[in-house]
Amino acid sequence: MIIAIDGTAASGKGTLGRTLAMRLGLDYLDTGLLYRAVGLAVKQADMDLETASDDTLKLLVESLDLSQNFGPELRSSEIGELASKVAAIPQIRASLLEKQRDFAQRPPHSKGAVLDGRDIGSVVLPDADAKFFIDAAADIRATRRHLELKARGEDIDFSDVLSAIIKR
C-alpha cells in the first residue's frame, strides 16, 4: 500500500503521515526532509550551488540514505532556506524523484509506505493507493511553524515566519 500526503507548508502533513504510518505499520518518508538534507550537505561541503556541476549534485543526492533518522538540525530556518534553493535545481529534483519513488515501491521495513510532501500525489506518486491534500489558513500554519522553531531554540519573529509561509 502506498499513501501520498500533499499539502501546503506547516499544514500538518507530517503529523498525519507519521500517525498513519505508525497505525498501519508502514514505512514513512517526509520528502521535504530530503531537500533539507541536501541543503545541509551543501552547507557542510561549503558548496556553491551556482557553480556545482550536475554530476556533483547527482552524487550528493545519491549519497543520501533514506532509512536514516534525520536530526533536528534539518528543521532550522537556515536549512529551510537552503532547501528552497536546492528544490529549484532540476537535476536535484529529478534525482530525488527517483529516490522517493524507489522508497515507495520498495519500503525498507514493511510492505507499504506513507510519503508526505509537495507534489507527492500529483507528480511523485500519481498512482498511489490513497492520496490526501492537507491545507490550513496561513496564520494557523505560521503559528505551527513559529512554535516548532521556538521549541528548537530559534529566535525568529512571527511576521518573518508568516511571510515565509505565504511565499511558499
Q: What residues fall within each predicted segment?
A:
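Walker A (P-loop) phosphate-binding loop of P-loop NTPases
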Residues: 10
